[in-house]
Amino acid sequence: MPRSPGTRLKPAKYIPVATAAALLVGSSTLFFVFTCPWLTRAVSPAVPVYNGIIFLFVLANFSMATFMDPGVFPRADEDEDKEDDFRAPLYKNVDVRGIQVRMKWCATCHFYRPPRCSHCSVCDNCVEDFDHHCPWVNNCIGRRNYRYFFLFLLSLSAHMVGVVAFGLVYVLNHAEGLGAAHTTITMAVMCVAGLFFIPVIGLTGFHVVLVTRGRTTNEQVTGKFRGGVNPFTRGCCGNVEHVLCSPLAPRYVVEPPRLPLAVSLKPPFLRPELLDRAAPLKVKLSDNGLKAGLGRSKSKGSLDRLDEKPLDLGPPLPPKIEAGTFSSDLQTPRPGSAESALSVQRTSPPTPAMYKFRPAFPTGPKVPFCGPGEQVPGPDSLTLGDDSIRSLDFVSEPSLDLPDYGPGGLHAAYPPSPPLSASDAFSGALRSLSLKASSRRGGDHVALQPLRSEGGPPTPHRSIFAPHALPNRNGSLSYDSLLNPGSPGGHACPAHPAVGMAGYHSPYLHPGATGDPPRPLPRSFSPVLGPRPREPSPVRYDNLSRTIMASIQERKDREERERLLRSQADSLFGDSGVYDAPSSYSLQQASVLSEGPRGPALRYGSRDDLVAGPGFGGARNPALQTSLSSLSSSVSRAPRTSSSSLQADQASSNAPGPRPSSGSHRSPARQGLPSPPGTPHLTILRGPQSCRLHPHGPPRATALADRAEDHPQLKTPPSKLNGQSPGLARLGLATGPPGPSASPTRHTLVKKVSGVGGTTYEISV
C-alpha cells in the first residue's frame, strides 16, 4: 500500500496481509503440486487450467487492491486555511440531484470533505468514496481500488470453491489410503479453503448487495440514506456498470521521484549557436544556483561568429587622457581657445544633471575689465595680490562647446572644487568698510599696463563679464542664461585675444552652430548713453517645453513694462552728471528705476545707488549689499577737497607705466570719450578678485550731451554696469573741480575690502 510522506513503518500492519498472501499462495501451490496431476489424468486436463486462471486473477486483483492509491485527497498547507480552521462551521450542506448532502470539516486535512468522502483513521487520509479500511490488503478501499477489491472477492470465492470441490473428488477416490502424503496434503488444503470460504463468501455477498444499491460500506454502516433516497444510486445495472466498467478516477497525490533527475544546464549569457563550436564547459553547481568557473577556450570559429554577429553591447568608452598631457595642453594655450589665458590649476563647479560634461574654470591671474577695442598684454604682465590669487572664480553657465577640445576632453576627469574658507565667505559681512578705517591701512595695489584705446562704430558688445556670467556656484540654467547666452564657440575678447568668452552656450543649438559671425570693433561712446537693444538670443525655443516657453514669454512681457517705466522715469528725472548727496531724489530714483536683466549702463548718480547693483550684492548678494551701503555712506561723508584729488592722482602717477585712460576700466557698454587728465574718476574692476576705485580726469559734460544727441538710439533707461546699479557709476564718475586737484604730488591710500563669495575690493582714496 502507498504510504503517506512522513509516516513511520509499522510491522504490525503487514501481519494480516502477509498471512493472507501466504495462505493464498501456499494453499494454491500445494493444490497444483499434489492434487492437479491425478485430476488431469482421471478427470480432465481442463481442471488445472481453470484453477490456474482463477488463481492468477486472484493474485492480480489482490495486488491491485493492496498497492493501488484508493483516491487520497492532498492535505491543505498549514497557512492556506489557517483562518478557516478556527472560524469555519463543522458542516456544510450541498445539493446532489436535489437532495441535501452534508459535508464535514476535516480538522486534519483542513478542508470540507466532499460527499461520500471520509477520513481513514488508520491511513490518516481523506479518501474519495471511502468504503472501509481492509487489513487483509493493508489499504483503504476507495473509489480508485474498490473495483479491484470487489473482483478480488469474487475471484477468491470462485477459486476457493474450485479448490474445495476438486480436493473433495481426490479424497473420495483415495479413501483406502488416507495416510498417504498426497491424500493428507489435499485434505489440509481443503480445510484451509473451507475455513476461509464462509467469511469470504459472506463478504462477497455483502459487497454485491452494496454494488447493486449504489452504496458504500461506510454509508451502510453509519446509516446514511437509510430512511431516505440515495442521491448517488444509478439503478442496479447502472451501479454494477459504474463499479466494473467506469473509467479509472484520477490520482490527486503524486509521490516525488526517488531518483534524482539529470538536468542539463547551459551556462548563461552565451548564445546557443556558439556552444557547438566552443570547448567543453566546466560548470560548478551549488545550492544557490550556478557558480561558473567557465574555463572555456575561445576557438577560431567562435571568434569568427562573434565578428559576424556582434553582441548587443553599448558603445565603447573613449580612451582616457593622461593627466600630464592635459596639463601640457593647458600650459601652452592656443590662440582662440577658451582656456588659453587660464592657469593649469582647475576648479569646476558642481555639474547639473542635464549637463554631460563641464569644462574646467581654473583659478589664477584674472584679466582686468577692459573695453572691446583695447589690447592688454598676457597674464605675465599683471601683478596680483595674495587675496586675488586665493579667490575662486566660478561662472554661472559655462560654455559647453569649446572650440579646441579633443575627443578625450569630453571625458577628462576634473578635480573637485576646493572649499571656501569661512573668512573668505563671510569677511564682507563682518568687517567695517568705512573710509576712516581704510585710511589707517595700506595695501598693495595692482599696477596695470598701459592700455591703448581704439575707436570703432558704436555697436552692442557682449563682454566676458556679462550680467548672466555673474559668480554663481550653482551652475544652474537660469532665465538670463537662456536669453543672454555667451558666444557658442567661445569668442575671443578683442582686448585679450588669448582669452575666450566664458559665456553660456545654449545646449539646444545643433553641433554645427559653432559661433557667431565676426563683428566690427566698437568705438568709444558716451558713458551716459545706453547701448542698443541686444540682439535676439540664438537659443532654439522649439526644443523647450511649454512651461519654459510660458515663463520666458511672461518674463519678456514684464521686461517690456519695466522698460517703459524706466524710459518714462528717465524723461522725468534728467541726469545732471554731478555728485549729489543722499536725498529724496536718489531714493525715489532707486525705487522707481528697477534693475534690468541685462544691458550694462554707466550713469552719474547719487551715493545710494552704489549698493543697488546685483554685481556688488544687489539682489543676488544681500550681505555684500549691506557692506557696500556702509561703504557708500563713508564715501559720501568724505570731504571733497583738492587733497583727496591730489592723493588719487598721486596713486595714478605712481603706478608703473603711463597712466591708463579713463575708458580702460569702463564697461564696454558704457565706454565714453577720452577724458582729460585732472578729473577725478572712479575705476571699477569687476570680478570676484578685485574692485579698485581710481580717480582720473573729469568727463566733458558738453561732449557727452552732444554724443547723446548724435546717437539718440543709444539713450536707454538706466541699467546695470557689470551687475551694479547706475548709482555706483554716478559715484565713480562724479565731476570735481579741475585745476589743482590734478596735482600728482601725494601718496595714495588703498583699502582692501572682502565681500561674500571671495570677492575683494581695493578702494584707492
Curated annotation (Swiss-Prot):
One of its GO terms (molecular function) is protein-cysteine S-palmitoyltransferase activity. InterPro entries: Palmitoyltrfase_DHHC. Residues 104-154 form the DHHC domain. Keywords: Acyltransferase, Golgi apparatus, Lipoprotein, Membrane, Methylation, Mitochondrion, Palmitate, Phosphoprotein, Transferase, Transmembrane, Transmembrane helix. The modification Phosphoserine is found at S337, S606, S627, S675, S725, S743. It is found in: Golgi apparatus membrane; Mitochondrion membrane. Its EC number is 2.3.1.225. The chain crosses the membrane at residues 14-34, 53-73, 149-169, 191-211. Residues 622-653 have a biased composition (Low complexity). This is Palmitoyltransferase ZDHHC8. The active site is at C134. The lineage of its organism: Eukaryota, Metazoa, Chordata, Craniata, Vertebrata. The DHHC domain is required for palmitoyltransferase activity. Palmitoyltransferase that catalyzes the addition of palmitate onto various protein substrates and therefore functions in several unrelated biological processes. Through the palmitoylation of ABCA1 regulates the localization of the transporter to the plasma membrane and thereby regulates its function in cholesterol and phospholipid efflux. Could also pamitoylate the D(2) dopamine receptor DRD2 and regulate its stability and localization to the plasma membrane. Could also play a role in glutamatergic transmission. One of its GO terms (cellular component) is Golgi membrane.
